Amino acid sequence: MASATQLTHRGIHLAGLYRSSWSKPLFRHLATKPILYSYWPSSCSWRVRVALAIKKIDYDIKPTSLLKTVSGHAYTDEYREVNPMQKVPSLKIDGHTLCDSVAIIHYLEETRPQPALLPQDPVKRAKIREIVELICSGIQPLQNVSVLDHIGKDQSLQWAQHWISRGFQGLEKVLSHSAGKFCVGDELSMADICLVPQVRNARRYKADLTPYPTIVRLNQELQELDVFKATHPSTQPDCPPEFAKK
């Protein structure tokens, strides 16, 4: 672990800050291990776990189920204080509680910019954000468990397949122009963090991926990276034994 004289935060030497009394609470917050409220199959939770892994941020997980029948579920007064929407993920870090996966990932990028998840080139940054929004605003919310529960069991699978396929049609076209080794060029980015969990959702709901060769290729490449393997839902502490990796 780095000593106080070695630690920096956004270019500020923390050792110098720590010597002033007003800054000691800030230093303590920065030195406190983050807590991630995560649910093992949640694609939103997986995004944040990957970002934390890429940034090499050590953290504790507090499993938070979205099933009311499981202990430690999100629908409690205690968790409502953490996340008023009672969804996952939430992250306690630097003395703050942050909710929503995309907001969390942006915070990590802005406070811990290396390794970078956004390039310096403004066009590439915009393209990455476009892909992130396409997935996180245009696809995943429409096949979220809370929506499918409202739709009803008889129609939920068809509903999920329809909206995933419709979203993937657009995503495939975007990626066919932007992709190199990864979603935008050859550098790992926020877009890749969002793609892999969404492909897992598509397979979970038995969507046909045959028409989307770029999506399939990128997913195969990305799944081989250690940051995705180590944070995979099947490796999580709250994953049921029948789904856990052997």
From Swiss-Prot:
Gene Ontology BP annotations: glutathione metabolic process; L-phenylalanine catabolic process; tyrosine catabolic process
Keywords from the named record: Cytoplasm, Isomerase, Phenylalanine catabolism, Transferase, Tyrosine catabolism
Pathway: Amino-acid degradation; L-phenylalanine degradation; acetoacetate and fumarate from L-phenylalanine: step 5/6
Sites where the protein binds glutathione: S42, S43, C44, S45, W46, R47, V88, D100, S101, Q140, N144, V145, S146
Pfam families tied to this protein: GST_C_3, GST_N_3
Function: Catalyzes the glutathione dependent oxygenation of dichloroacetic acid to glyoxylic acid in vitro. Possesses low glutathione thioltransferase activity toward 4-hydroxynonenal (4-HNE). Has no glutathione thioltransferase activity with adrenochrome, phenethyl isothiocyanate (PEITC), 5-hydroperoxyeicosatetraenoic acid ((5S)-HpETE), prostaglandin A2 (PGA2) or 2-hydroxyethyldisulfide (HED).
Cofactor note as given: Glutathione is required for the MAAI activity.
Domain GST N-terminal stretches: 32-116
Record domain GST C-terminal: where: 121-241
NCBIfam families xrefs: maiA
Entry protein name: Probable maleylacetoacetate isomerase 1
GO MF assignments: glutathione transferase activity; maleylacetoacetate isomerase activity
Annotated source species: Drosophila melanogaster (Fruit fly)
The reaction(s) this protein catalyses: 4-maleylacetoacetate = 4-fumarylacetoacetate; RX + glutathione = an S-substituted glutathione + a halide anion + H(+)
Enzyme Commission designation: 5.2.1.2, 2.5.1.18
A cellular component term, taken from the record's GO annotations: mitochondrion
